[in-house]
Regions:
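Generic protein-terminus/edge-of-domain signal
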Residues: 1-67, 74, 82, 99-111, ...
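N-terminal positioning helix adjacent to the helix-turn-helix/winged-helix DNA-binding module
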Residues: 123-126, 174-185
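Hydrophobic/aromatic-rich alpha-helical bundle segments in the mid-to-C-terminal region
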Residues: 144-145, 167-174
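Linker/hinge segments immediately adjacent to helix-turn-helix/homeobox DNA-binding domains
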Residues: 157-170
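Ligand-binding loop in jelly-roll beta-barrel domains
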Residues: 73-98
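Basic/polar phosphate-binding segments, predominantly the helix-turn-helix DNA-binding elements
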Residues: 159, 188-212
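Amphipathic alpha-helical segments enriched in hydrophobic/aromatic residues interleaved with Lys/Arg
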Residues: 106-155, 159, 187
Length: 212
């Protein structure tokens, strides 16, 4: 199954058995998301609503058709204003793809500490076209569905990597804010997953309220 219109699971890591899975979601539920991470990579394509995505100490207020690259194990959470409908595509991607170069953009996002792709209208239309074709193919049961869906997924990821690796996106320092204390805390958690990570211990180490 490549496609689902059911809600994206909110467990700490989630589960993905196939190479990738595409979600197209629209809801207006009042939900609080805790900090979490996944064992797979994630692409978020924001379509409409009011949302801010927090990833490893950086906060990105989103505009329609903004794209976020969330590397596996990156600690993140969305902050959603439920006063308006929230619509997005979510793409989950396994780490053991046959073509590993398609995952280069996630490592580069981590290296740059920058996860946002904001596109010019021309590049935006190109990715929209591929994405909608991918959605249509993933939904159908027609002849060759698996082959075409895989090909469209690879095409989408090739263009996404070209855009991000070659910095063809629109960069604006005002497109995000940075919390150095939260970033330091999350980095500590990432590197000490076997240590005592209780709320009390972390609050004491970083001098923050455990209710923060």
């Amino acid at each position: 199954m490549f496609f689902t219109d059911q809600n994206e699971p909110s467990e700490k890591t989630g589960y993905l058995n196939e190479a990738f899975r595409l979600f197209h979601l629209r809801d207006q539920a009042s939900r609080e998301f805790s900090w979490h991470y996944h064992d797979f990579h994630k692409v978020v394509i924001f379509l409409s609503g009011k949302a801010t995505y927090h990833i490893e100490g950086r906060s990105y207020p989103l505009k329609p058709w903004d794209i976020l690259l969330v590397d596996r194990h990156a600690i993140h959470r969305p902050e959603i204003d439920s006063s308006v409908p929230y619509e997005r595509f979510i793409l989950w991607i396994q780490n053991d793809l046959p073509y590993q170069e398609l995952l280069s953009c996630f490592q580069k996002a981590r290296d740059r500490s920058y996860n946002l792709i904001r596109l010019s209208s021309g590049l935006q239309e190109k990715l929209k076209e591929i994405l909608f074709q991918l959605e249509d193919s993933a939904r159908t049961q027609a002849f060759g569905q698996d082959i075409l869906t895989q090909a469209l997924f690879q095409e989408f990821m090739v263009y996404l990597n070209r855009i991000f690796l070659e910095k063809q996106y629109i960069y604006d320092k005002k497109s995000y804010s940075y919390d150095s204390q939260i970033a330091s805390l999350l980095q500590y958690i990432n590197h000490n997953l076997q240590a005592d990570l209780s709320v009390e211990k972390l609050a004491s180490r970083y001098y923050v309220s455990k209710y923060h």
